Structures are given as C-alpha cells and as structure tokens.
Amino acid sequence: MNSNIIKSIDIIPNNNNNNNNSVSTVNTNSSVINNNNNNNYNNNSISNGNNERIKVFIVHGHNNIVREKVSKFLFEMGFEPILLFEKPNNGQTIIEKLEKEISNCKFGIVIMSPDNKAFTKKDSNSDYVEIAYPRLNVVFEFGYLIGKFGRSNVIYLSVPYNGKSQNYDLPSDLLGYVWINYTEDLKELENEINFGNYKKL
C-alpha cells in the first residue's frame, strides 16, 4: 500500500432515533462536511508528507453545479479542494486573499465556462456576432496559476457551450493551451490526475 495514503475521515453518527433520514458528519483534517447516507466519500487522502491532504486551488465562474461536482470529486480522490469564496476574509483585499490561498496549494484546476456574452466582429467590414466568454476574473486567475505553478501543474477544464468544448472567446495567448473536456463522469479529469504527477507534488 502506498505510504502516502492515510485515513483521515471519522464518521460521527446522528443519534436522533426519531429521524429516519439520519445525517452523518464527516470530520476531515481541515473542514467539516455534512454527508447524507447516499454519498460515500473515499476515506483515503493524498498526503504531502505531513499527514495533510494535497491542496488544489479551483478557479471557477458562475456554473455552481460544475464547481461543486469538481470539488466533491477531488475530495473523493483524496485531495483538499480550495474554493476562494469559502475562506474567511480576515480584512484582506480580494487579491491578498487570492495570493494567500494559492500559496498553500500545489496545483490548480481552472473551470472555464461560458458565463458571459458579448457582441464582436472580426474586422471593420464584418457584422457583429454574439459570442460567449468566461468571466474575466477566471481568465486572470488562470494566468496567475500558470505563473505560480507552471503550465504543467494547471489543468484547464473546458465546459461545453452549445454542445462544443471551448466554443467561446479567449485571449489569443491561451488558444494553444491543451484543455480537457468536462463530462458528467469527469473521466478525462480523473485520467489527467492519475497519469500526471499531481499526486506526488
């Protein structure tokens, strides 16, 4: 068995016998997560050598369903997903809070979703056409993660728009960046993590 895999979850049962839909509490090293009986979390952790889960920073836009699905998936894989809005402000500016939380992580996942729409044209003689594009803070944080971790430690997860992946406008600097498709089973994300070096960071 891999020595980096540790048990880190305790299930605290609900002792209320009058409630048929009992809810258990999952205690992790860093947070408390409510878990009903239909969700079985993996109780193995990817350790960084100090009996702590490897932290991964998640950049996201307004697609809350995808955000929560990816976060839960990473937790089940043994990582500690970090979402900026869940962390206390402690009087910090947004950029200070961003810098602090990213500095504690080993790699990042950018969920690129087409949250905004605008009109553009290719040249002065063209008609305006409607385009979708990610929120600008997502693009900014994408670049920040690349500068912090390097391209090899930043996973670009593309949420389809009108049935096509990366079917939205991006800065030209990012057009050559290889992305993986978001799917309901997150299989491509799982393969990227398993076959990459993310568990050894």
Swiss-Prot record:
GO biological process, one term: signal transduction
Pfam families the UniProt entry points to: CAP12-PCTIR_TIR
InterPro entries cross-referenced by the UniProt entry: CAP12/PCTIR_TIR_dom (IPR019302), TIR_dom (IPR000157), Toll_tir_struct_dom_sf (IPR035897)
Induction remarks: Up-regulated by phagocytic stimuli.
GO molecular function: NADP+ nucleosidase activity
Domain TIR residue range list: 52-186
This protein's name: Protein tirC
Organism this protein belongs to: Dictyostelium discoideum (Social amoeba)
